[in-house]
Amino acid sequence: QQLELGCNYRMTDIHAALGLSQLERLDSFVEQRHSVAKTYFEELKIDSVVLPYQHRDCISSFHLFVLNFTDSAGPRSQSEVFNRLRDSGVSVNLHYIPIYRHPYYSAMGFERSHFPEAEIYYQRAISIPMYPNISEDEQSFVIDVIKSDTSKKFEMPKGFQDLF
């Protein structure tokens, strides 16, 4: 949450050097993310879920994988799936919290009613784990939780990474 107006601090030389060293691995990272995204696209074909749109002339780096839940989501609503993933130990996020919901901007008089489309998106979208080294078992676990009946309880198997 943004409580007050802040500054945009620039990165240090050390951070720049680290970034440059990571560029050598960029193609590998993107390739791994594409593999993860391919599995999500294949496994999450659910009527109530809209998967990320990819134009045929563009190549995404998939820094996020956002699921957008439709009005007809029923038991697979955004909040239900979000809570089931979180309760199961999976790190799931809302991307992005609209600016008018942050205390700094709401105090300036910005209201939800001023931005109905942003509010709809916020209430329907979640980001699921997307990183190059997610294991097949971890990704399968995420998929199973999303596709499951809402009454089913999940516990993360021992040995899963703390990156969740």
Role assignments for model-derived ranges:
Residues Q1-F164:
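PLP-dependent aminotransferase class I/II
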